[in-house]
Amino acid sequence: MNKTITALAILMASFAANASVLPETPVPFKSGTGVIDNDTVYIGLGSAGTAWYKLDTQAKDKRWTALAAFPGGPRDQATSAFIDGNLYVFGGIGKNSEGLTQVFNDVHKYNPKTNSWVKLMSHAPMGMAGHVTFVHNGKAYVTGGVNQNIFNGYFEDLNEAGKDSTAIDKINAYYFDKKAEDYFFNKFLLSFDPSTQQWSYAGESPWYGTAGAAVVNKGDKTWLINGEAKPGLRTDAVFELDFTGNNLKWNKLAPVASPDGVAGGFAGMSNDSLIFAGGAGFKGSRENYQNGKNYAHEGLKKSYSADIHLWHNGKWDKSGELSQGRAYGVSLLWNNSLLIIGGEAAGGKAVTDSVLISVKDNKVTVQN
């Protein structure tokens, strides 16, 4: 293991002398969303506010170009998908017309040809924040995420409390001091058909819903990795959705980032190797929860993982490290590798760089 990581450090040092993977993002970028269509990358929202940008990865002079602003206001934790020439944005957390923080269940569509947005007359049957989105056979699929009513109620209470610190402490204690199942994270799988703009029930997890999981899909299989089991408590679980045949099958794989797990990690594929990297969590929270402390992360400091794990022979192996721990950026499949754009580093600082993780013969290469 030490030899592997030492070799990785040498590779990282050699890449440092070369050109960066992508130009720095126009603003420090975290908690946003992004997609790739052929060779064009689109990113937006999160710490970028309502801004969206695109970049042609094959251009000689690579640069981010500003697009039309998102009309739905600033959003964190929205997701996106590119289907049949259009970019779709699903939900997110933002402020409503009254200035209250809330979870949205709406859908916006961006047309690259006209550089224009439209809000669709379509609403998911539940809120979408902390959820994941992936595309299969021309449809967008959504699963996971927080419970809209519980989350919105929490922020309504905080708004009413104003600057009353005593009231805020009581609200937080009430909100965090519950068991995981009492938060009703979404375990349903929903499908969105762009041609009809209709939502449909596509199945549900036999286990539990998560928020802030990493997602990657290839062919008929999709993997959901880690995420929150409740606010402040992560899981090390890995779920596999198999669309092969007529019946969707849910499988549970060996855990990763044990015992505490992380949220906001990055997942991808390279030469058929499943990759999981980064993420943030609270070390010791799982032990606290198992010992009966529901407010499991109380008093704990958020830590950021730099670990890179590969799925190999039915188990996860730590196979390398990022140059720094990071979470809550965008992960995309590009050039047969995992492309990470932006994210959040220690102290919650948003970053502007990109990272490319490639795998060959179970050996990891990291390019910054």
Curated annotation (Swiss-Prot):
This is N-acetylneuraminate epimerase 2. Pfam families: NANM (PF24996). It comes from the Bacteria. GO terms for cellular component: periplasmic space. SUPFAM superfamilies: Kelch motif. Its main location: periplasm. It is found in: Periplasm. Residues 1-19 form the signal peptide. Kelch repeats lie at residues 40-84, 86-137, 139-173, 174-219, 222-265, 287-336, 338-367. GO terms for molecular function: racemase and epimerase activity, acting on carbohydrates and derivatives. NCBIfam families: muta_rot_YjhT, PRK14131.1. It is an enzyme of class 5 (isomerase). The active site is at E228 (proton acceptor). Keywords: Carbohydrate metabolism, Isomerase, Kelch repeat, Periplasm, Repeat, Signal. HAMAP family: NanM. Converts alpha-N-acetylneuranimic acid (Neu5Ac) to the beta-anomer, accelerating the equilibrium between the alpha- and beta-anomers. Probably facilitates sialidase-negative bacteria to compete successfully for limited amounts of extracellular Neu5Ac, which is likely taken up in the beta-anomer. In addition, the rapid removal of sialic acid from solution might be advantageous to the bacterium to damp down host responses. Its EC number is 5.1.3.24. It catalyses: N-acetyl-alpha-neuraminate = N-acetyl-beta-neuraminate. Belongs to the NanM family. Homodimer.
